[in-house]
């Protein structure tokens, strides 16, 4: 019985950690496919489209002070020239991509 419980706990830990890793990978993949064309590879808005639309980089004070909730709202409903993604991404996907984007904000 102890072996069964130990194996079950080990499986939960392994699959739980794998789930966390896939969450990060999913946010990165979504960012690359939906956001990078304007926000740039690392959020610096250094792409052609980002420069043309005058997207603010993650180093901009306005971007740096945004909370996670504000970023989620911006992706969900759009902001300035950025389109809304509420009909293109699920709430979970929006949270994942914002989580990934926030890794650039220092």
Regions found by a protein language model. Name each.
Residues 11-14, 45, 58, 84:
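A general structural-boundary detector
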Residues 15-30, 46, 61-64:
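Electrostatic cytochrome c docking/interface patches
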Residues 1-24, 74, 100-106:
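Post-cleavage N-terminal segment of exported redox proteins
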Residues 28-54, 79-81, 103-106:
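Periplasmic/extracellular electron-transfer cofactor-ligation site
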Residues 21, 32-35, 89:
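A composition/secondary-structure signal for short, hydrophobic, low-basic-content segments
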Residues 2, 28-30, 91, 98:
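General helical secondary-structure elements
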Residues 4, 44, 48, 67-70:
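N-proximal short alpha-helices
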Residues 52-105:
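Extracytoplasmic electron-transfer domains, predominantly the class I c-type cytochrome c fold
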